A protein has these predicted regions:
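Amphipathic alpha-helical assembly/interaction segments
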Residues: 1-165
Length: 165
């Protein structure tokens, strides 16, 4: 799946689980960085903001994961939109942290850029899923057997029935 050509957004290998998605990896990185900055003495004292920004960053990861496992593109897309909303929430809370001087301008700009990148990746994934003919794993058809395989199974059943008589 191709999500874009810049910022390592290209999904080069087959996606087997949500952990394989580049956007999930970026969200995980963001969450780890959010936990790191909220441990700083000045930031850590604002318990309400620390709780909110951590929850919002965790929500990005969680919604990508939960949506992926739902089994339909429609449900996955719904959860990706929620993840996008959480991404914007993190940006708003970063602005509060910057305004309160819990983080410096460079840190603020780097975090905001990472949030925008993640939001863009989510948007690209949503666009891809909306245009995909594949509607999700719930709609996968089981692999069809060749006529030779079916005949072989029938012959095996007949043989088994004769042996048991």
């Amino acid at each position: 799946m191709v999500q874009g050509s810049s910022d390592k957004m290209v999904q080069s290998s087959r996606v087997e689980s949500f952990e394989d998605l580049n956007v999930y990896k970026q969200a995980r990185d963001l969450t780890n960085k959010i936990y790191e900055i909220t441990r700083q003495v000045s930031f850590s004292k604002d318990h309400g903001l620390v709780d909110q920004i951590r929850r919002a960053s965790v929500s990005i990861m969680s919604n990508i994961a939960e949506g992926f496992e739902r089994g339909t593109n429609a449900e996955f897309i719904q959860f990706l939109y929620i993840a996008k909303g959480s991404c914007v929430e993190v940006r708003a809370q970063l602005t509060i942290a910057f305004d309160q001087k819990y983080i410096d301008e460079n840190t603020y700009k780097n975090f905001v850029e990472q949030c925008r990148r993640i939001s863009g990746m989510l948007g690209n994934l949503i666009t891809y899923l909306k245009s995909s003919r594949f509607k999700g794993s719930k709609f996968k058809r089981p692999p069809t057997k060749s006529m030779a395989e079916e005949l072989n199974e029938i012959l095996q059943q007949i043989k088994h029935e004769k042996e048991n008589k």
